[in-house]
Structure formats: structure tokens, C-alpha cells
Amino acid sequence: MMNQMGMMMQQQGVGVPGGPGGVGGVGMPGPGGVGVAPGMMQSPQMQQAQQQQVQQQQVQQQQVQQQQVQQQQQQVQQQQQQQQQHSQSAQQQAQQTEKVDNISKVKVLVGPLRDALSTTIKTAAQLIQQNTLADAGSKTVDLNNAPRFDKHLEEFYSICDQIELNLKTTKLCMQQCTSSQQYLPIPVATSQPPLPETNALTYNQYLEVVKLQIGYAKDIHDTLICAAQNISPSE
């Protein structure tokens, strides 16, 4: 009977009464000690192993988060680079398609011309004031630190020359366009299939026009030579 009760108590994790250090499952010393089931107690080594596993999982999660953050940063940088490249290409295309005719160049040079004129006038005023004070004897003039009037004046004239050249070129282009419209106002037909324009010249007609223009130029040349010979006749 006692043996059966002891077996039941061992299964339930209860120490067997009587006798010092009775053990039930894992018995506690002393009479009537309460036992603990084998699966309920964990050794310190197992606890350390679990803690290490938890720490490793946390470290892995942190690494994964850092990798995700780095990937996001890289994506943002790539997007910024792509945007910069698109903006640069758009600027280059805009610069290429921008008008580079002489009138546009003149408009661009108006601003620097205004600044150069203002700087030149200010420099001249400063020099006049310094010379006046020096003549009055109230101040000594330091020639090394004096403003360079000649430099600013040269810059002003340089911009004026650029504007003048662009305007002259524009005038010549307009004259050429006017002459072209005057002497050959009708477009020339090529050897391709006939174009829908009804007022286009054929190639034979174009040759006749060219011959007439050559003859006209030759007549002018001969007239000029005769006039030169009449003005200064040879002995």
C-alpha cells in the first residue's frame, strides 16, 4: 500500500512523507517535502542558451532593419541622381534648342553693358574725388589702391564692340534674305516626285534663272570695269 502511494506521489510530483529527505519526483529534503516535476526546472546553462538565442534574434532583427534603411537610402540617392540627370539633360536640350541668333546675343549683352557702364561711371567719380582732394592737399593718394578706370572702360568698349558686330551681322542676314526673296522668290523643285506646291519651279526653269543671274552679274562686272577705265584711262 505504501509503495503504491509512493508511486502515485512520485507521478504527481509530491514527496513521500516520513523519513528524512523523502523524494517525490525531484524531492526536497525534509519530511513531507514537495517535489517538482522534472520538466519544470531548467538549468542555468539552458537559461543562458535561451538568452543568447534571444539576443542573437534581436541582433539579426537590428541588422535586417539597418539593411532595409540602407536600401531605402540607396533608392533615394538613385532617384535623386536620376532627377539630376534628367534636369541636366533637359537643360542641355534647352540650351541646344535655345535661339543663338544675333538678336538674342544682343539682348543677353544688354545687362553686362549696363553693369559695365555703371561701374565705369562710379570709378570715374571716385578718381575725380581723389584727385580733387589731392590737389587741395587734404589727402594723399595711394596709387596702388586706386581704382582702375582704364580696365572698366576697356570692358565697357569690349561689350559695345560685341553688340556692334552682332547688329552688323543681323543687318547682313536681313539683306541676304531680302535679296534671296527678290531674285528667287519661288521654291525649287527637286528630282523627287512632284511636290503639292503648284508654284514650284522645275529643274530646267531653275537652270534658266541661274543663267540669267550669271549673265546679269557679268554685265555688272563689265560695266564696272568700263567705268574704272574711263575714270583713270591708261596712257
Swiss-Prot record:
Compositional bias annotation for Gly residues: 15-36
Protein name from the UniProt record: Mediator of RNA polymerase II transcription subunit 29
Annotated organism of origin: Anopheles gambiae (African malaria mosquito)
Family classification: Belongs to the Mediator complex subunit 29 family.
GO biological process, one term: regulation of transcription by RNA polymerase II
Major localisation: nucleus
Keyword Nucleotide-binding: no
Signal peptide: none
Keywords: Activator, Nucleus, Transcription, Transcription regulation
Glycoprotein is among the record's keywords: no
Subcellular location, record wording: Nucleus
One of the record's GO cellular component terms: mediator complex
Protein's gene: ix
Biased composition (Low complexity): 1-14, 37-54
Function of the protein: Component of the Mediator complex, a coactivator involved in the regulated transcription of nearly all RNA polymerase II-dependent genes. Mediator functions as a bridge to convey information from gene-specific regulatory proteins to the basal RNA polymerase II transcription machinery. Mediator is recruited to promoters by direct interactions with regulatory proteins and serves as a scaffold for the assembly of a functional preinitiation complex with RNA polymerase II and the general transcription factors.
